[in-house]
Amino acid sequence: MASALIEPRVLRGFRDYLPEEMIPRQRMINTITAVFERHGFAPLGTPALEYSEVLLGKYGADAEKLLFRFTDNGGRDVSLRYDLTLSLARVAAQYGNLPVPFKRYQIAPVWRAERPGHGRFREFYQCDVDIVGAAGPLAEYECIQVDYDVMT
């Protein structure tokens, strides 16, 4: 018995990036990364999956509608990250021996389960630069300067 043909398609709110889009996109990411590193920021990678309680901490009940949430094979309540900052907060709490100030950048996909619309996808890249453990307005100024340098 022959199996039914599966229609090749992408889920609503998601998209493929073919080479003609990926090549300039990758160049842009490389340019941004170079600016971040020139300012002394280090790359950070975190898992796409986090315990749901970590991701619910920032917005609580409001975050529920953002989460792609499920129970994994081990029975744990997990979700795809919808924001990179929450993973940074977990890293800062989990690893007490990070340098102070901890200057990190992260460019990675995030997922939001909210309704997709024109220009609003369920999977997209987020680009973050943060300084953890620095007091005062100079850290804020430095982040603004980095943003300015990326845009110019």
Where are these regions (language model features)?
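TRNA-recognition modules of translation machinery and tRNA-sensing kinases, especially anticodon-binding
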Residues: 1-152
